[in-house]
Amino acid sequence: MGLCDIGLKNKAVRDLDIPEVPLVKLDTLWLQVGGTLCNLQCTHCFISCGPQNHTHEMMTMKDVQQRLLESKTLGVKDYYITGGEVFMNAEIFEILATILEYGPLDVLTNVTLITSEKAARLKKIQNNSSHKLQFRVSMESFDEKLNDRTRGKNSFRKATE
């Protein structure tokens, strides 16, 4: 039984008049476009992403477009995407280009799936945008053995190629 379940069983909690706070402004929007699917299985992952975790499905381009339209009315200035691993999403390049039409974008990734062809596509997307495209690369250490112990065999080599 979770804390929410315990709280709901408590009459004092159930009887609280909790006000609803409308969302009228939002500066930053985080989108979990990679769902919980990841090519790695890091020991510390806070949502246990991995190759078989489909708890939260990847966002589709249509899902992203809906959130972007909402974000415009809320005044969002910055966008972040995360997962799982965002580069497992088949629509990732279209998603990146579309988000960049709205504002600067930070991509959280382990970069192990980036090939030279994908890097060239990313460069083209950045060059066609007036907004900045940045990457936040997740690694545990500059030490290959330590990194691989946490993220999986050969993850350091794949990320640094």
Describe the function of each predicted region:
Residues 1-31:
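N-terminal [4Fe-4S]-dependent radical SAM core
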Residues 22-62:
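Canonical Radical SAM [4Fe-4S] cluster-binding loop centered on the CxxxCxxC motif
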Residues 28-30, 78-80, 104-108, 132-136:
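Structural preference for beta-strand elements that scaffold enzyme active sites
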Residues 33-34, 82-83, 110:
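A secondary-structure boundary/capping signal
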Residues 42, 83-84:
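Conserved phosphate-binding and hydrolysis motifs of nucleotide-dependent enzymes
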Residues 52-66, 85-127, 135-161:
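Canonical radical SAM enzyme core domain
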